[in-house]
């Protein structure tokens, strides 16, 4: 029970931090105007097209080559899916709108800020469209259906502008994530090669005349050899010439300590040496990725 409560508290704190980060003053001046403008234009285009094609009449069909205009009503969701059960489209499109609106609120990613409104308002447009009755040519009023009119080929599914917004949003988000993953891997590989070579040499690589610029980093000892850490501007290094701490990161497993400690700089889990039963010194688990935050025994005792 205690573990579950701790998990809920941690989740709550994470959500609060994410919300604050995604709604900082500078960011909300950009993201919510984007949401409003894109929402306005998506809804405007959807219902201008709906009105235009309704005037052409249900059943109207013309072909311009690649694009065929085929005006029909659709009781399903995008591309005529689930058209046998009227409850499913309402549920799916409403959930889609709510989920992606919440995702937008908690997002600070620039690509998502631009693309999520396409999906959100595409889904909302279909929900509104479905709630507006359509009068057929024979005078029959049809409810719980959207108006579809675009078709690539005679044999393909028929869709509307809201469907285009949803599919385009999903496709571009997927493409963005693929590109980000590729760039992150490339950057990480490049960074690992460059920083590892630099750190392996450590204090040895700093000329004697340059060492005077480095000062003791008060109360910070190397988590691996317990020697004094040195600091110069925003760079930190172990003063032990024989300390190859970058190699030892492999034996420093993320071991939770009492009142689990997180790095104050990057919020990653703090680690200790496997044989350090007293947790004399802790270091950020990203110690080999240029996050040099450490915590001495003295600091731990003060926080207890």
UniProtKB/Swiss-Prot annotation:
- List the catalytic residues: 148, 163
Q: Which GO terms describe its molecular function?
A: aspartic-type endopeptidase activity
Catalyses which reaction? Answer: Release of signal peptides from bacterial membrane prolipoproteins. Hydrolyzes -Xaa-Yaa-Zaa-|-(S,diacylglyceryl)Cys-, in which Xaa is hydrophobic (preferably Leu), and Yaa (Ala or Ser) and Zaa (Gly or Ala) have small, neutral side chains
Q: Which UniProt keywords apply?
A: Aspartyl protease, Cell membrane, Hydrolase, Membrane, Protease, Transmembrane, Transmembrane helix
Q: Specify the protein's topology with respect to the membrane.
A: Multi-pass membrane protein
Tell me yes or no: is Protein biosynthesis among this UniProt entry's keywords. Answer: no
Q: Which GO terms describe its cellular component?
A: plasma membrane
Kindly list the residue ranges recorded as spanning the membrane: 28-48, 86-106, 112-132, 163-183
Q: What InterPro entries does its record include? A: Peptidase_A8
What pathway is it annotated to?
Protein modification; lipoprotein biosynthesis (signal peptide cleavage)
Q: Tell me where it resides.
A: Cell membrane
HAMAP family in UniProt: LspA (MF_00161)
Purpose: This protein specifically catalyzes the removal of signal peptides from prolipoproteins.
Q: What is this protein called?
A: Lipoprotein signal peptidase
Q: Which organism is it from?
A: Mycoplasmoides gallisepticum (strain R(low / passage 15 / clone 2)) (Mycoplasma gallisepticum)
């Amino acid at each position: 029970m205690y573990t579950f409560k701790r998990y809920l508290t941690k989740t709550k704190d994470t959500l609060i931090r994410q919300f604050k980060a995604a709604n900082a003053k500078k960011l909300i001046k950009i993201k919510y105007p984007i949401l409003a403008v894109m929402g306005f234009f998506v809804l405007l285009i959807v219902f201008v097209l709906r009105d235009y094609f309704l005037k052409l009449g249900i059943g109207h069909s013309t072909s311009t080559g690649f694009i065929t205009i085929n005006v029909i009503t659709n009781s399903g969701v995008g591309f005529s899916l689930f058209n046998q059960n009227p409850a499913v489209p309402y549920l799916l499109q409403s959930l889609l709108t709510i989920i992606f609106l919440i995702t937008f609120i908690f997002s600070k990613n620039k690509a998502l800020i631009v693309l999520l409104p396409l999906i959100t308002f595409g889904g909302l447009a279909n929900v509104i469209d479905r709630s507006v009755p359509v009068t057929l040519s024979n005078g029959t009023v049809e409810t719980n259906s959207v108006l579809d009119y675009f078709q690539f080929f005679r044999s393909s599914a028929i869709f509307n502008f809201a469907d285009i917004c949803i599919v385009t949003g999903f496709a571009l988000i997927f493409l963005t994530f693929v590109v980000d993953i590729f760039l992150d891997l490339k950057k990480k590989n490049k960074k690992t090669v460059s920083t590892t070579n630099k750190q392996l040499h450590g204090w040895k690589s700093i000329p004697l005349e340059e060492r005077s610029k480095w000062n003791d980093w008060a109360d910070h000892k190397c988590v691996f050899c317990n020697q004094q850490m040195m600091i110069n501007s925003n760079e930190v290094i172990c003063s032990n010439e024989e300390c190859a701490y970058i190699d030892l990161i492999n034996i420093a497993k993320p071991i939770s300590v009492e009142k689990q400690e997180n790095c104050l700089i990057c919020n990653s889990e703090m680690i200790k040496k496997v044989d350090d039963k007293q947790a004399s010194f802790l270091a950020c688990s990203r110690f080999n990725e240029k996050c040099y935050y450490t915590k001495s025994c003295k600091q731990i005792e003060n926080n207890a």
